[in-house]
Amino acid sequence: MAQQTIEQPKLIHTKKGALSYKEKTLIMGILNVTPDSFSDGGKYDSTERALLHAAKMAEEGAHIIDIGGESTRPGASLVSADEEMSRVIPAIERITSELDVQISIDTYKASVADEAVKAGASIINDIWGAKGDPDMASVAAAHSVPIILMHNRKERNYNDLIPDMLADLMESVKIAAEAGVSDENMILDPGIGFAKSYEDNLAVMNKLEVFSGLGYPLLLATSRKRFIGRVLDLPPEERAEGTGATVCLGVQKGCDIVRVHDVKQIARMTKMMDAMLNKGGAHHG
């Protein structure tokens, strides 16, 4: 008789309850409370507008709202921790008081993450994979919150792209573990669009199963990014279909969470993908 493998529960535990990614792909809706993000800068930088947009995304199928107060687009101006907090904290407090939705704080500054979690955020999303701020992993450990460790590096000096990326990500895992973050509180992100050329981004998309095979939940953040614009020759606001294609490939290759702007359309795509892949173990009626 074949030995049975014990199936992982596939749960992300947060202080707002557990998120299961076993039956469905989780949707993270992007909320930039910044004046200069590449795709929606300035649209949601008042607390009231931020709340309305978060509510709309939650209604359209977002399980997590990812709030960022500093644009990460190439060439964006740097923002002080105080300025970043003045943007994100009021939005987090307002959304937490009005909506029953998980909030992730998109920051690489430990002080911002700390205040954001105190204000109601339940996940930390760090584009520097706990390598940008030496205190970030400790903040995640102190609050016992999940942390998304994204692949990034200062230079594109790869010897061999995929193995180098895997080594970089495992370095982030090691930093987090040494600070006291538990394995089940780590989520990985291959960092599409960060320290990668156009060709690199396409190559990573083609090898996503290698990253989902590491045993951690995998987040894919491709929404409206430049490599999609280059393939389709379209501006950011016209990249929903291209984003959808990347999401469908990602789901097929084992991604568990997708971070997107166009929640309504993408949620329909992931629901269809999940049904075809029989993700919940029983076909959806």
Where would I find each of the regions flagged by the language model?
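Conserved hydrophobic/aromatic pocket- or pore-lining residues that grip, position, or stack substrates
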Residues: 31, 61, 124
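Catalytic domains of carbohydrate-active enzymes, especially glycoside hydrolases
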Residues: 52-68
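N-terminal structural segment of carbohydrate-active enzymes
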Residues: 12, 25-28, 49-51, 56
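N-terminal binding-site loop/beta-alpha segment at the start of enzyme catalytic domains
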Residues: 20, 26-48
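Active-site-adjacent loop and "lid" segments of alpha/beta metabolic enzymes
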Residues: 6-7, 14-15, 39-53, 72-94, ...
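N-terminal carbohydrate-binding accessory modules
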Residues: 2-23
